[in-house]
Amino acid sequence: MSLLVIGINHTSASVDLREKVAFSPEKLTKALDELKNSDAIQSGVILSTCNRTEIYCEVKHGISSGYVINWLAEFHHVALETLMPSIYIHEEQAAVKHLMRVSCGLDSLVLGEPQILGQVKKAFADAREHNAVEGTIEKLFQQDFSVAKRVRTETNIGGNAVSVAYAACTLARQIFESLSDSTVLLVGAGETIELVAKHLDDSGCKRLIVANRTRERAMGLAEQFNAEVISLPEIPEHLPKADIIISSTASPLPIIGKGMVESALKLRKHQPMLFVDIAVPRDIEGEVAELNDAYLYSVDDLQSIIDHNIEQRKIEAIQAEAIVSEESAEFMTWIRSRQAVNSIRQYRENSEAMRIELLQKSMQALASGQNPEKVLAELSNKLTNKLIHAPTLAMQQAAKNGETEKLTVIRTTIGLDN
């Protein structure tokens, strides 16, 4: 058996090709059934995300990566010549190491991102549900999850914000001790604000107000995160309630001005307000930063935080890579020891079968009245010849082919050079 990974990802393939070989839930079910029933594949897991499609499998002896690549191309009706330039292949320890790097976020578009581990776990769960995993692959994925946990525990690779939305929420958490006690006003209802709302919700934010030009779009966020919805003209009325204001609209002019904030601060009795403006052009007048108790951060401020955090993640990645190298080597040691156990068991079974076969013939000879000494001598001769037959042939072949190292190994194995 051999461990194998074949796949494409965001660095090797275009979005168009990644879409063509992605596995929808319906396709995944069919694909896992095909893998399970294949004569060439012992066990397999399919990982399919927007950034990668990968097949992790244990293939039977003599099966090459070409078999799995051909299967992938045929399954998705993609020409092999279209697929091949974007395919990468990892075997044995390289396959183990690749899976661990993927799960730890070391191979992600955003270095250290944690979402990929959940996607790997789901891919494994789907394969188990379809009885497509067993043996080495099952052990590999279980070990992989332990390694990912170790990397998250022993390094800070996922602890620094590297997206604008996440950086905005991280900033809010740093300034306000508990988001569960803070009111957040989100201005806008686009994709970035939706991500901000999700991060805030994950951080325990309980009071959320969404202000948007159209209420319909904002209502979707409100239902998802139990938020209050207001229109843009209603912002001055609700601004004094907000401790944190995060804004991202496509407005050509500022929505929140210095005077509006000044009035809100008076009504709040100058309790601090955090303004995070991630819009371009800006939604919040720059003069707001001149006010006492108003703290304004722009998208440029966040970008400098993100750039710093990316560098920090790169430093943490060095330690993470070392952990992955160590753990992948340990897993291969386990595989080799397992292979040795299987070989020893098979050798013992074969030897025992020889012994029983010859013993039965000898017992029959004794029962028929043959000379016991002659029967025992014949038994010992035949048993010796059968046991030395395979190593004798191997030594003859090695000598004939000039394979000195192989001959030395055989001699050591059978105790001639001990």
Curated annotation (Swiss-Prot):
EC identifiers of the protein: 1.2.1.70
Signal peptide: none
Catalysed reactions, as listed in the record: (S)-4-amino-5-oxopentanoate + tRNA(Glu) + NADP(+) = L-glutamyl-tRNA(Glu) + NADPH + H(+)
Binding site for substrate: T49, C50, N51, R52, S108, E113, P114, Q115, Q119
Enzyme class, UniProt record, top EC level: oxidoreductase
Binding sites annotated in the UniProt record for NADP(+): G188, A189, G190, E191, T192, I193
This protein's UniProt keywords: NADP, Oxidoreductase, Porphyrin biosynthesis
Single GO molecular function: NADP binding
Pathway in which the depicted protein is active: Porphyrin-containing compound metabolism; protoporphyrin-IX biosynthesis; 5-aminolevulinate from L-glutamyl-tRNA(Glu): step 1/2
GO biological process annotation, one example: protoporphyrinogen IX biosynthetic process from glutamate
Active site: residue positions: C50 (nucleophile)
Annotated CDD domains: NAD_bind_Glutamyl_tRNA_reduct
Residues of the site described as Important for activity: H98
Family annotation (InterPro entries): 4pyrrol_synth_GluRdtase (IPR000343), 4pyrrol_synth_GluRdtase_dimer (IPR015896), 4pyrrol_synth_GluRdtase_N (IPR015895), GluRdtase_CS (IPR018214), GluRdtase_dimer_dom_sf (IPR036453), GluRdtase_N_sf (IPR036343), NAD(P)-bd_dom_sf (IPR036291), Shikm_DH/Glu-tRNA_Rdtase (IPR006151)
UniProt comment concerning the protein's domains: Possesses an unusual extended V-shaped dimeric structure with each monomer consisting of three distinct domains arranged along a curved 'spinal' alpha-helix. The N-terminal catalytic domain specifically recognizes the glutamate moiety of the substrate. The second domain is the NADPH-binding domain, and the third C-terminal domain is responsible for dimerization.
Matches recorded under PANTHER family: GLUTAMYL-TRNA REDUCTASE
Description of how the protein assembles with itself and partners: Homodimer.
Misc: During catalysis, the active site Cys acts as a nucleophile attacking the alpha-carbonyl group of tRNA-bound glutamate with the formation of a thioester intermediate between enzyme and glutamate, and the concomitant release of tRNA(Glu). The thioester intermediate is finally reduced by direct hydride transfer from NADPH, to form the product GSA.
Family: Belongs to the glutamyl-tRNA reductase family.
Described purpose of this protein according to its UniProt entry: Catalyzes the NADPH-dependent reduction of glutamyl-tRNA(Glu) to glutamate 1-semialdehyde (GSA).
Protein name, entry field: Glutamyl-tRNA reductase
Organism: Aliivibrio fischeri (strain ATCC 700601 / ES114)
Taxonomic classification: Bacteria, Pseudomonadati, Pseudomonadota, Gammaproteobacteria, Vibrionales
